[in-house]
């Protein structure tokens, strides 16, 4: 279990956390806007905006995947408005979260700060950027990985 009091957030760790946060957010934010896959990229966009308009999945419209990502995205649409940037902020923040958890996990197993940084940045590059937008398979994988690492 990751214990942040044991892994004191000193200046080096704080600097690495800032690097990981900025890198993991912006690498996903950048690559998510390079192109789209009509079948996958907009899978949760429409259903999330419909939830925001008061409709409920299954009762009012058909969904092809789980409901978790739709409701999380509806929350982001509520905060940032229904637009592409709100859609991408969701996946970019999720990339930050999982990358930081991976970093602290590597510190917990005493991998070393620099190695943990490099591996966490590598993880951030590969984790959510393959889709760029909220995607049910990636959310499911990472929501299972988070408690495993914690």
Task: Show which residues each predicted segment covers.
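Alpha-helical transmembrane segments of multi-pass integral membrane proteins
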Residues: 73, 87-94, 136, 148
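Short acidic/glycine- and proline-prone juxtamembrane loop motifs at membrane-interface regions
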Residues: 132-140
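Membrane-interface starts of transmembrane alpha-helices
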Residues: 12, 82-86, 90, 112-118
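Transmembrane-helix signature of polytopic, membrane-embedded enzymes
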Residues: 102-125, 141-142, 146
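Loop-to-helix entry region of an early transmembrane alpha helix in multi-pass inner-membrane enzymes
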Residues: 67, 80-100
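Short, Lys/Arg-rich, polar N-terminal cytosolic tail immediately upstream
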Residues: 1-9
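Transmembrane signal-anchor helices characteristic of membrane glycosylation enzymes that use polyprenol
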Residues: 10-39
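Extracytoplasmic catalytic/substrate-binding loops of multi-pass membrane glycan-assembly enzymes
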Residues: 32-47, 57-75, 82-85
């Amino acid at each position: 279990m990751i214990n942040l009091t044991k892994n004191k957030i000193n200046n080096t760790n704080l600097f690495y956390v800032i690097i990981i946060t900025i890198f993991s957010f912006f690498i996903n934010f950048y690559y998510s806007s390079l192109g789209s896959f009509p079948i996958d990229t907009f899978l949760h966009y429409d259903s999330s905006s419909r939830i925001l308009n008061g409709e409920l999945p299954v009762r009012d419209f058909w969904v092809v995947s789980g409901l978790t990502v739709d409701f999380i995205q509806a929350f982001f649409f509520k905060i940032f408005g229904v637009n592409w940037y709100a859609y991408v902020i969701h996946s970019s923040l999720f990339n930050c979260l999982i990358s930081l958890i991976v970093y602290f996990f590597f510190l917990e197993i005493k991998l070393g700060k620099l190695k943990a940084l490099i591996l966490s940045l590598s993880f951030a590059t590969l984790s959510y950027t393959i889709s760029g937008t909220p995607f049910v398979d990636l959310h499911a994988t990472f929501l299972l990985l988070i408690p495993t690492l914690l």
